[in-house]
Amino acid sequence: MNFETTIGLEVHIELKTNSKMYSPSPVNYGAEPNTNTNVIDWGYPGTLPTLNKGAYTLGMMVATALHADIARDTHFDRKNYFYPDNPKAYQITQYEQPLGKDGYIEVEIDGHKKQIGIAELHVEEDAGKNTHGSDGYSYVDLNRQGTALIEIVSKPDMSTPEEAYAYLETLRQIVQFTGASDVKMEEGSMRVDTNISVRPIGAKKYGVKSELKNLNSFNHVRLGLAYEIKRQSQLLIAGETIRPETRRFDEKSGETYLMRVKSGADDYRYFPEPDLPPMHIGDDWLKEVQDNMPEMPAKRRTRYVDELGLPEYDAGVLTNTKEMSDFFEAAVANGAAPKQVSNWLMGEVNAYLNDKQIDLQETALTPEHLAQMINLIKDGIISSKIAKKVFQEIIQNDTDPKAWVEAKGMVQLSDPAKLTPIITGILDDNQQSIDDFKNGKDRAVGFLVGKIMKETRGQANPKVVNDLLMAELNKR
């Protein structure tokens, strides 16, 4: 029996704001517990929320980037539930009329493009965080309570774990390029829940879906979905019934485990939020958002290929993060050849970042210094070998590359007037190598070049050395 899979994703993204969605409490990741919170977040009687317009504007930017229809008239709703990390016993969200509807993302998998629909996206506030201590007590940190979120709900348009992975990666890039969020799963600013069901091919009715939680990376999403496809398919083959469940993914075993069985639809008793007025998005506000939309990663990739002559692979790597893409553009603007900048960023820079497990912004490297170093190579002032030493200096210490090279005596020797006497001297001492060259033994040239480089302590320009050496050999 063959099956088809249906996958939908719900993604919560923390918006990059200085204060919370409905209160003036600051937002600082990693702050001491319960230091970024106030009576509005706690739901004290008599306190009133105030909408963070900046957060809503960021939500509109994300909606625009996802090609969604933005609701011009909307309101906020209360989602009622009790949990220790939610002292108000309700969440302010958008239920009846979300910020945006009917958007889409275009993903590419193995060279094939596919459009995945966005059912809706809405702004809301986050809950706090529960921690269960080894001392038998549970602790609540309300720093996160009230933080501005946008929830993006996909349509059930995905059918493989690879499509889900590509969707999340593309969504991460798009949101990051808008500047609305850092979208770092390790810091909780991007969280993913999946819904997945399996049914026999050709069946009109969707299968019973399971929800997956505890997905801490895109790879965990892919692995968890792959396991669920296998698990649900085996149940159907065995003639067993699939229950509507919430399951968690265990990264050690690569399997999913039951958290709870869903007995029915959750009843959150939504009703319009009485403490916030209805929202109207005027023409001026919408136009301001549209006029200030930054270039999206797909457009940058196209421009890098069409205008800068980069291979598609390079363009894809460079636009994986806005940080790397902006750095590339700044280095090119400082006069370095695009392909050379790309080579250094994808090679030495990425290797350094991976080795140190840090981001580019945590290094001392600047676009100006990288461009200057690349041009030192182009102008023959330093060799590629010396450039690697220069690179280690400028990425760690914010050093001017040209000044450092000159101070260290690393300027490449390219003057024929200085190189010729060295070359002739080495030839005079190595008649056997001259004879080998004349007898067609090409390795003799390599031997002589090595002697010259040793004599100049590696500072001789290899191209100039080769040209002068060949000219001198042909004279003898």
Curated annotation (Swiss-Prot):
<dbReference type="GO" id="GO:0050567">
    <property type="term" value="F:glutaminyl-tRNA synthase (glutamine-hydrolyzing) activity"/>
</dbReference>
<keyword id="KW-0547">Nucleotide-binding</keyword>
<dbReference type="Pfam" id="PF02934">
    <property type="entry name" value="GatB_N"/>
</dbReference>
<dbReference type="GO" id="GO:0005524">
    <property type="term" value="F:ATP binding"/>
</dbReference>
<comment type="subunit">
    <text>Heterotrimer of A, B and C subunits.</text>
</comment>
<dbReference type="InterPro" id="IPR017959">
    <property type="entry name" value="Asn/Gln-tRNA_amidoTrfase_suB/E"/>
</dbReference>
<dbReference type="InterPro" id="IPR014746">
    <property type="entry name" value="Gln_synth/guanido_kin_cat_dom"/>
</dbReference>
<comment type="similarity">
    <text>Belongs to the GatB/GatE family. GatB subfamily.</text>
</comment>
<comment type="function">
    <text>Allows the formation of correctly charged Asn-tRNA(Asn) or Gln-tRNA(Gln) through the transamidation of misacylated Asp-tRNA(Asn) or Glu-tRNA(Gln) in organisms which lack either or both of asparaginyl-tRNA or glutaminyl-tRNA synthetases. The reaction takes place in the presence of glutamine and ATP through an activated phospho-Asp-tRNA(Asn) or phospho-Glu-tRNA(Gln).</text>
</comment>
<dbReference type="InterPro" id="IPR017958">
    <property type="entry name" value="Gln-tRNA_amidoTrfase_suB_CS"/>
</dbReference>
<dbReference type="InterPro" id="IPR042114">
    <property type="entry name" value="GatB_C_1"/>
</dbReference>
<dbReference type="InterPro" id="IPR003789">
    <property type="entry name" value="Asn/Gln_tRNA_amidoTrase-B-like"/>
</dbReference>
<dbReference type="GO" id="GO:0050566">
    <property type="term" value="F:asparaginyl-tRNA synthase (glutamine-hydrolyzing) activity"/>
</dbReference>
<dbReference type="GO" id="GO:0006412">
    <property type="term" value="P:translation"/>
</dbReference>
<protein>
    <recommendedName>
        <fullName>Aspartyl/glutamyl-tRNA(Asn/Gln) amidotransferase subunit B</fullName>
        <ecNumber>6.3.5.-</ecNumber>
    </recommendedName>
</protein>
<keyword id="KW-0067">ATP-binding</keyword>
<keyword id="KW-0648">Protein biosynthesis</keyword>
<dbReference type="InterPro" id="IPR018027">
    <property type="entry name" value="Asn/Gln_amidotransferase"/>
</dbReference>
<keyword id="KW-0436">Ligase</keyword>
<dbReference type="GO" id="GO:0070681">
    <property type="term" value="P:glutaminyl-tRNAGln biosynthesis via transamidation"/>
</dbReference>
<dbReference type="Pfam" id="PF02637">
    <property type="entry name" value="GatB_Yqey"/>
</dbReference>
<dbReference type="InterPro" id="IPR004413">
    <property type="entry name" value="GatB"/>
</dbReference>
<dbReference type="InterPro" id="IPR006075">
    <property type="entry name" value="Asn/Gln-tRNA_Trfase_suB/E_cat"/>
</dbReference>
<dbReference type="InterPro" id="IPR023168">
    <property type="entry name" value="GatB_Yqey_C_2"/>
</dbReference>
